[in-house]
């Protein structure tokens, strides 16, 4: 697997969870110490391990991680310049799926050892198609589904549905049948095209000579796969293939089916690729060997000799690629292939020349373009490759040195403390422990032994003894603190707290004494037997790291001094002396399992007389587990990581697996497709949920793609427009749309573009201002609704009741500034001066009309702006009500002649005041309609308002 896929997963983690999660995933997958190169190959287990690490860190379901990684990989390819290629691979989504293998072949130019999966389609209809997915890897189904969903959404604006009809994993191989549902609108056009081609066949006959010239590498074979005819270009390379079986000469590489006539009939829409089973090399008659017959010396034979520069060089194989057409009239299969070559050196070894290709074959141009490459560029690439190899070797050496340093650091101090130091780079560590058992072990009469042996023998003796003691310490799970000369210090309960600290140290010392009894030093005759003595004490201590150049983990406290005194005051070799605290704690933890003998009082320096005891032996087994779980877990994780890193990657080698074996394994275990099983239904349900959950993250990534800082330089503005075509379900943002701030951010893709053709991005302050204006508009709408409702209610009451009630409205009190003026009690000369000029000296109806108009103008001047749409709605209902009111006034005028004039006049005055209100609103309305008309002002609403 190439690093391009790993980089895509890292891109997904960075965009979706952030750099902290990415660092944690890299540490769990052993990728933190080296950079990933897109053109280097890595183990197939890296990506599944990354998915597993993401699941453990974030708790996201595994299937959802796979779908999300597939969707983000499409965006990653777009950012790296592959978007233009994928944008032109198919006019319709069905065409794109049919050409997936062609995309992989294109990538093979940059990634020559690519082991791509195989895709081919069946049962295409107007509602979708059936896709067969075959791969040499397992665990990538959700990853592929995510890619298909994102490709359809980004490039074709389609929301597709995917259902797993069949899934099988056999060894390292995966065979899946997917049903992809979408609106396949182009299928009818394809059927019409086939009908046109069928009609053209009657008018465009092709003679055999022209056909052979167009396809010099064609192969014709029958249903038994017998080769009937081959092109001249192929016969120049493989002259004796006619009459042989296709399966005896070639290996079917694509598609992943069994090489049979039935399989070819079913997969006619696929591009086939076959490769010769045996290498093809050029033969020449320049070197002639003469072989003399044993019977007659007259007869000689000439033998062609194969010319090869180096027998260890890679041998060339003939690779043919093209469609297979079925000739129904003769029941013959025709492979219209072209020969695929990589380099000129391969052509020379095979004996292939440019004129062997057809005149319309594009391989000529590709090969000529290869020849024209600059020699300087080749030299630079070779030098860069050598530098890269040197850098890789240096990186490997640095990694080994770091690994060794970590190992030494974890041996010098506790594992957790060492990890903290490696992460932070600081040596500041101090921790208090309430109850710790400390043990000291000393070699007896060491000064006398040193007199009889040389200095290097002394070192060798101590090293041998301490090595035996180290193995015992690891067994009981206690911690070796340090060695000072002939003294050996251990502890339990620190740095790892334990409820059986005293029992652990006591058991360890008993085993040490027992082991030393049977120990014999063979290197020197003067020292055969070695004796030790032990001292144990329990109490509180403080542990921490001291030193900078050579940091050490040390224990401090009175307990350490007392434990040392327990050992030094012990005068009996091969015994274990303990204090009162240790005795009480051992009896509590072991429940009388130890046989402890009192030794009376012993004078201890700095302590005076202390009661001491001697541990003789123990009966029964230990209540704790005799192992160091943390250290064993660390070793297991380290071993597992090293196995994953050192595992041989089969992708580094050229693929030699026959695709026929894949097809045979499929056919041998295939069964009829019936109803979906429960596991498949559950899988389809999970897939649908994960697609829906990952859609939001993918849409958010589209917004980031529109940012010019994130957009790659090769991504043109026109391509960005194609990518972001609005879907049918989307609508443009209006000023009075009730959207939250997050909805506004997601809908920015629908905002209009400026004169330069680029999408303007509103700032955060502008978005806040738009939200504020929207809230004010909503509040104003509610106020307008309330006012309109009150006015309509008053008008309806006037229409239903007696007309005289409408006249009484003129006598109502009207709020005017700080004073309440009643016109029924005040003469016209008592009206304020600012209002008197607007009142004519006319009939009371005209006076009421003017007063109502003045009142409405005051109300409108104090009210804020509202939306145009709501004003239009408000003005509709009073108009209808006014018409009903006028009709009722005319009817009542006939009945009451005395009151008709004043009533109708007052009613019409009130109606005229409403019209005046409408006119005033129309004049003072906001510019919302103009804002909608001018797209540039949509993000500048705050300045307009």
From Swiss-Prot:
Query: What cofactor does this protein call for?
Result: heme
Its primary localisation, in coarse terms, equals cytoplasm
Instruction: Detail which positions bind heme.
Output: 104
Task: Spell out the coiled coil positions from the record.
Answer: 388-413, 763-802
Taxonomic superkingdom: Eukaryota
Recorded hits in Gene3D superfamilies, A to Z, give:
6.10.250.780, H-NOX domain, Haem NO binding associated domain, Nucleotide cyclase
Give the enzyme class: lyase
Q: Fetch the PROSITE patterns from UniProt.
A: GUANYLATE_CYCLASE_1, GUANYLATE_CYCLASE_2
**Cofactor binding: number and manner:** Binds 1 or 2 heme groups per heterodimer.
SMART domains membership: CYCc (SM00044)
Activity regulation description: May be regulated by molecular oxygen. Probably not activated by nitric oxide (NO).
Known tissue expression: Expressed in BAG sensory neuron.
In this chain, composition skew of type Polar residues spans 711-720, 732-744, 817-828, 862-884
GO CC annotations, alphabetized: guanylate cyclase complex, soluble
Q: What is its EC number?
A: 4.6.1.2
Residue ranges of region Disordered? 639-679, 706-930
Subcellular locations according to the entry: Cytoplasm
Give me any GO biological process, just one: sensory perception of bitter taste
Give the note. There are two types of guanylate cyclases: soluble forms and membrane-associated receptor forms.
Provide the protein name: Soluble guanylate cyclase gcy-33
* The species this protein was found in: Caenorhabditis elegans
From which lineage does this chain's organism come? Answer: Eukaryota, Metazoa, Ecdysozoa, Nematoda, Chromadorea
Which gene name does the record give? gcy-33
